[in-house]
């Protein structure tokens, strides 16, 4: 007997079911990370620029920049922007590194020249003091004269005593004996290349009116001394400064009205002292400030290498 299967079973089709799992991908990132990265890059650039500026300028220039940022005035005519100092019109040439032996030799030469200049200056000031003392002795003014060698130069004090006054009381009219002394001193001061400062001092006796006071009197007396020196042949460019101190620097503070407080001081400056004054008042700034800074930098490098 022929087997006949179930037609329904024979005619049925096999259905294959495929299950597909869909993965949800994260959405696209926004542009916030670009902003953060740009801020980070800008901050790093500012940091590197600051480090470069600090490394490019010298110590004195850094102090000038700091003073300018704080609104302070600086003696060498400051007001220059730091960019003017570190951004030259032409790119700087690459620095050549000198051999240690050459650097040390140059440092020794500088130290030797500085020592010779100091020795020469001290010798000249000593000879000047001897000449001034001789002139004062011949004029019988030993009691009116004092001299002192200080780091800035030779300090010459010509003062009143109980017997003689250099000027008429309360006036800038110079007395004959003091004029004679200044005339004798003029060629002595002119014999050296050193500049001089003339300063007037008074005692503490006050004026009755405020129109003319001890400031005016001390300044006028210093100017009178300068005028006599120049009339005696001393060049006018020999005087670097004329100043008035009134009664601010009394020699005899216990006796403010003492005659010894009334005096004229003549300071014969060393070369370094006059250079410092040029620096303070802004003249010859490039010729004075930069060499001093370079000299100090070289001395610092030399001291670090010898440690």
UniProtKB/Swiss-Prot annotation:
Gene3D superfamilies: OmpA-like domain (3.30.1330.60). It is found in: Cell inner membrane. One of its GO terms (cellular component) is plasma membrane. Residues 154-272 form the OmpA-like domain. It comes from the Bacteria. It holds the Pfam family OmpA. Keywords: Cell inner membrane, Cell membrane, Membrane, Transmembrane, Transmembrane helix. Residues 87-108 are annotated as: Disordered. The chain crosses the membrane at residues 32-54. It is a single-pass membrane protein. Belongs to the MotB family. Part of the flagellar gene cluster Flag-2. However, the Flag-2 flagellar system could be inactive in strain 042 due to a frameshift in lfgC. This is Putative flagellar export/assembly protein LafU. It comes from Escherichia coli O44:H18 (strain 042 / EAEC). The gene is lafU.
